[in-house]
Amino acid sequence: MAIHLKNITPYIILSAISIIVFSNSMNNGFVYDDSVTIVNNSLIKSWNNFHKIFSFNYFILSGELSYRPVVTLTYFIDYFIWGIKSTGFHLTNIFLQLANTLLLYVLIKQITKSGKI
């Protein structure tokens, strides 16, 4: 039992830190360019537009000034899960941050091979 807890303790600590640090965003609304990329972006609100997310004309059609299909795909998925509720989008971002934190820990652990980071 003690060995098992020793192995998962860093993951629990990193998860708790990520959640604590980013949880203050949960009650915030959309900001900055979210009105263009999410709130007023009709292309993320219909399955008929799914293929357009990956087209090179997306940034012209959407009003965005950049072509970021993976980011836009997350907006598309978020919209169908949460609707236009910013809290859901923030929750997804916390989950993605947490996943990246844990992946970075695993990568560093593999690179160093010590497991004592």
Annotated model-derived regions:
Residues 23, 101-105:
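Alpha-helical transmembrane segments of polytopic integral membrane proteins
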Residues 1-20, 110:
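Start-transfer (signal-anchor) and selected internal transmembrane alpha helices
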Residues 25-83:
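Extracytosolic (periplasmic/ER-lumenal) interhelical loops and adjacent juxtamembrane/interface segments
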Residues 104-117:
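Transmembrane-helix signature of polytopic, membrane-embedded enzymes
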Residues 18-19, 26, 91:
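Acyl-group handoff/entry surfaces in thioester-processing enzymes
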Residues 6-14, 68, 72, 89-90:
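Residue-level signature of transmembrane alpha-helical entry/exit and packing/kink sites
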Residues 16, 33-34, 74, 93, ...:
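Generic structural signal for small/hydrophobic residues in well-ordered secondary structure
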Residues 69, 83-102:
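Loop-to-helix entry region of an early transmembrane alpha helix in multi-pass inner-membrane enzymes
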